[in-house]
Amino acid sequence: EDPIQEEFSKSCRKSIRRALKSGIDYKVIENPENIDEFLKIYYSTMDRNHASTYYYFDKSYFDKCLKYYRKNIILVEAIYKNNIIAAGFYFYYNRILQAHLSGTLSEYLHLSPAYIIKYATARWAKEHGMSYIHYGGGTSNSLEDPLYLFKKKFTKNTEFEYWIGKKIWNSEVYEELCKQKDVEETDYFPAYRK
């Protein structure tokens, strides 16, 4: 068995085997030059999930990421019948790989390409001497958050404690940002990003 899969849950390993058997392949691109396909997939995922406008990073954001951090970026693609059906955008530095953004085309969700993205990422990380992969959390603070639970399947033996500071340093500016976003009382912090 693949040694990196020791971290993966049993159901995760099964999904990876099934996806590979169905014909999904993958490609890891170091220092990517063109991320247009990734952007199409990412934005379609945000549409499907009815994401907040906050998550619709504009093209200039990605252009700046590539301009300043290209040598520390990998783009991971899941490929099925010569089509890119899912992709992940990652940063790495000092032996830590950080998941940033990812997406899957709706019509291929049944093939579970997101599992292949994580599998390919873990293989690349191991081959390149990474000590940790940080996938981030979910879309809420709940321990039952579906995205968080999905990511947890890939880290059976490793879990990081994670804290977010919730201090408001400038109440006036904070309140103005909340007002601009028409935000009411919420448990989400910072409220203007909800």
Region roles according to the model:
Residues 67, 111, 120, 158-167:
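Repeat-unit-sized solenoid/scaffold elements
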Residues 1-3, 131-194:
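Active-site/acyl-donor-binding loops of N-acyltransferases
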Residues 1-110, 123:
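A conserved beta-strand-loop-helix scaffold within acyl/acetyltransferase catalytic domains
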Residues 16-22, 76, 83-89, 127-149, ...:
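A broadly tuned preference for mixed-charge, low-complexity surface segments
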Residues 94-156:
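Acyl-donor binding region in acyl/amide transferases
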Residues 50, 73, 129, 158-159:
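Secondary-structure boundary/capping signal
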Residues 64-68, 125, 151, 176-178:
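Alpha-helix boundary/capping detector
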